[in-house]
Amino acid sequence: MLYHLLYPLASDFRIFNVFKYLTFRTIYAVITALLVSFILGPWVIRKLEALQARQVIRTDGPESHLKKSGTPTMGGILILASIVIPTLLWADLTNRYVWTTLFVIVGYGLIGFTDDYKKVVEKNPKGLSPRQKMAGQLLIAGMAVCFLVFVVNMSTELAFPFFKRLHPDLSWFYIPFAMLVIVGASNAVNLTDGLDGLAIGPVAINAATYLLFTYIAGNAKLSSYLQTPYVPGAGELAVLCGAMVGAGIGFLWYNAYPAEVFMGDVGSLSLGGGLGTLAVITKQEILLVIVGGVFVVEALSVIFQVGSYKYRGKRIFRMAPIHHHFELKGVAEPKIIVRFWIITIILALVAISTLKLR
């Protein structure tokens, strides 16, 4: 919005010329997201407490979690506001990639909001059924991917980290593959959100990593030099990534151990869906497995646990997702959280190194 309002005035007021610079708008998207979080955060928490939107704690989980009973949830509403408002203020709103990513983030946020509202406000412990949630996720992901492929004419080739000449064209198979990336990322972040600050830290690190990759993808010279896929217009997503980073850090202010508020499904589903969409647009889908390695391991731990119990009658872990396994082994919650952050930082550095290791 500010880009469209103020940049045209640059011919008369040179100061407004800064709005043409993507780096300037990205930095201020981060700052704006932080301000939105800090200004609205206390108010959102009070409203959630007034609604009695309190987290329901599983009795079969770690005993240390029982003290968290009554902590407000649905804090993802604050995250959504901290992403959407800065993006609308600082991004080029004629960019179709920006709108596609916002569509997925808000759409998945609505699915999560509905599920959370039914569980914690209407006191319906089942919330949305797994089929209903999956149907909604697939529908939104399918609409986004079809728009990108058929309207934007996005390439259906796949890029592999470390291999500069390996670009297989999936053709029609790319559509279900891209949908799987978006839906899988959304649910993986959702599964990771089980400890104070455990999910939001890696999400912010992932968003910062994709900020770099969106900037490179949208720059013809840089993408050619680094031999990465060139996606005209993708650079504008750096603004949205900046908003995600700021929203993540801002929410962590309230979600750090011991948490004042939880993000709920409204936050985790939308953030994961946003990361998946960024990966699809930048043609860095496989890279998400690296930088989002913590999310991948969390999701796989659940899949392996369920599969092992169903077919062998035995559990692999004491409890899944795997962060609960470490809790039951006696590792302190803050230590698990910080170690997962450290692992994510290392994985982000490995992901960035793929720009040169080809």
Swiss-Prot record:
It is found in: Cell inner membrane. Its EC number is 2.7.8.13. The gene is mraY. It comes from Geobacter metallireducens (strain ATCC 53774 / DSM 7210 / GS-15). Keywords: Cell cycle, Cell division, Cell inner membrane, Cell membrane, Cell shape, Cell wall biogenesis/degradation, Magnesium, Membrane, Metal-binding, Peptidoglycan synthesis, Transferase, Transmembrane, Transmembrane helix. This is Phospho-N-acetylmuramoyl-pentapeptide-transferase. InterPro entries: Glycosyl_transferase_4, PNAcMuramoyl-5peptid_Trfase, PNAcMuramoyl-5peptid_Trfase_CS. Belongs to the glycosyltransferase 4 family. MraY subfamily. The keyword Cell inner membrane applies. PANTHER family: PHOSPHO-N-ACETYLMURAMOYL-PENTAPEPTIDE-TRANSFERASE (PTHR22926), PHOSPHO-N-ACETYLMURAMOYL-PENTAPEPTIDE-TRANSFERASE HOMOLOG (PTHR22926:SF5). GO terms for cellular component: plasma membrane. It is a multi-pass membrane protein. It comes from the Bacteria.
